[in-house]
Regions:
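Bacterial N-terminal signal peptides
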Residues: 7-16
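Divalent metal-dependent hydrolysis catalytic cores, especially in the metallo-beta-lactamase
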Residues: 124-144, 162-169, 198-211, 229-231, ...
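Active-site neighborhoods of metal-dependent hydrolases
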Residues: 193-206, 211, 256-401, 476, ...
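C-terminal cap of metal-dependent C-N hydrolases
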Residues: 431-477
């Protein structure tokens, strides 16, 4: 408390002109969405959920200057600097900006035929930011040059969007289902691919379903030599084997772990229906699952939760969100609703409800045992999960998995920042950190659905109008 009060007192006597440090020039394409850009902004009388997992603090004042949090404490003792713009946020809550850890820039093309995933560089950056997501990892790229150029455009103030950590192209073996994926020839090909994309700016890599153990080992070795992490959506390789090979993160959780299939062949992706049946028979409290969790924790392997995309496979379960439908093109909307109806028609024979329930249990158990659980949405599947809105749904589903709302917010903010090596800058609300934060109507620590009630999103101290961002991309998802 003493440090917070001193920070506030310093502000009282600091000349107002000392806050006039030049800000990045924002293009008209970005400034149209800006609602708050005063040199000093005070968020007064606001409830704070700081992302650390600590209990909410009532009636706080948070002061932003030069893109950073410069004071935070009880409103009674945290004075507002002279000349600051004061926002009375009574009844509202501020949380750290979400850190999306499975947040692609592509979306499934409607219409059937060949599986194609066009880049959504127009709509998705704005939707992520509108949803309160201030940093993302793309976790697999199908148009890596587009992702890298988009990252630079956002950083330079040319386009509105979150801070982007670009994952390189998929490291996929023979048998890729999408034409946009290169199929690795051997371990040397994997090494060369990693080296090539690190040189061009990729900051992580994602191994995919048909990668061989030798290819994964080569990719991990090459990436780690540069201090770069590797994650994976695996099928050919089980979680324990991947941990032994040095992988840093595993996507989706046990929904995709095939190691429990008794007759699985080494290095081969088995029949998904058979793998699902095997998983249904596994007890989360049983020795095989507990041994796997122990191995992941011992090897410091994180797990990225992507509950929203799997929820859409459970008949009648995913909410029919009007915001999502409004964002879609008519063709994308029809394609999504058609597939959704088909899923419901198969409810009598679906294994998805049982698998989804088991995934919820696994994620809670993994975290309870000390595993680092991350949060993302994965805007793929059959199109029911889209940027920003899906990230909010992920937080809600973490609560359903057994976490408290405050714990779920911690997972979706601080944990992601920790994995990215950015926790000293983002992920929690504290003096000295970047002012990446979200103003919500209501109290998500009591009603987690209030995570959807985004009013303002601050990134580097600039406050963006969530509603304007959403309105600007209506009817674009499914196209661009």
């Amino acid at each position: 408390m003493r440090r917070i009060v001193l920070s506030s007192l310093c502000l009282l006597f600091w000349p107002s002109h000392s806050w006039s440090q030049a800000k990045p020039t924002l293009s008209p394409a970005v400034s149209v969405f800006v609602k708050e850009d005063a040199p000093v902004v005070a968020l007064a009388h606001v409830r704070v959920v700081d992302g650390t997992g600590a209990a909410p603090r009532q009636d706080q004042t948070l002061v932003i200057a030069d893109g950073k949090i410069v004071a935070l404490g009880d409103s009674a003792v945290t004075k507002t600097p002279v000349g600051a713009k004061v926002l009375d946020l009574t009844g509202r809550t501020v949380i750290p900006g979400l850190v999306g850890m499975h947040d692609h820039m592509f979306y499934p093309s409607p219409g059937g035929g060949l599986p194609l995933y066009p880049e959504h560089a127009s709509s998705f950056p704005r939707l992520y930011l509108a949803g309160g997501v201030t940093s993302i990892r793309t976790t697999g790229s199908l148009e890596p040059y587009a992702d890298l150029e988009l990252q630079q455009a956002v950083d330079r103030g040319k386009l509105a969007g979150p801070k982007i950590h670009v994952t390189g192209p998929y490291l996929e073996g023979e048998g890729a289902f999408a034409l946009q994926m290169h199929q690795l020839k051997d371990a040397e090909d994997a090494r060369q691919m990693v080296e090539f994309w690190i040189a061009r700016g990729a900051t992580s890599f994602k191994a995919y379903m048909n990668i061989t153990p030798d290819e994964l080992a080569a990719a991990v070795k090459a990436a780690h030599a540069h201090g770069i992490k590797v994650t994976g959506h695996l099928c050919s390789i089980g979680f324990r084997e991947a941990a032994a090979l040095g992988i840093d993160d595993l996507e989706h959780g046990i929904e995709v772990d095939t190691e429990f299939l008794a007759d699985k062949k080494p290095g081969v992706c088995p029949n998904p229906q058979a793998a699902a049946k095997a998983l249904l028979a596994v007890d989360i409290a049983g020795k095989p699952m507990q041994d796997m969790i122990h191995d992941l924790v011992a090897h410091h392997v994180a797990v990225t939760s992507t509950l929203p995309v799997f929820e859409t496979s459970v008949p009648g379960r995913a909410p029919l969100d009007g915001r999502v439908l409004d964002a879609m093109t008519p063709e994308a909307r029809v394609a999504y609703l058609t597939r959704r109806a088909r899923v419901s028609d198969n409810s009598a024979t679906s294994d998805a409800p049982g698998i989804f329930k088991k995934e919820l249990e696994f994620e809670h158990e993994f975290s309870k045992q000390g595993g680092l659980l991350l949060a993302g949405l994965d805007p793929t599947g059959y199109g029911g999960v889209i940027a920003g809105f899906g990230d909010q749904r992920e937080v809600e589903l973490l609560v359903e998995a057994g976490f408290t709302p405050v714990e779920a917010i911690h997972i979706a903010t601080s944990n992601g920042a920790e994995f990215l090596g950015e926790l000293d800058k983002i992920g929690t609300l504290a003096v000295g950190k970047m002012a990446d934060l979200v103003v919500l109507e209501g109290d998500p620590s009591v009603h987690i659905k209030d995570i959807e009630k985004v009013e303002l999103v601050f990134k580097d101290g600039i406050g963006y109008d969530s509603a304007k961002l959403i309105d600007s991309v209506k009817g674009l998802v499914g196209l661009r």
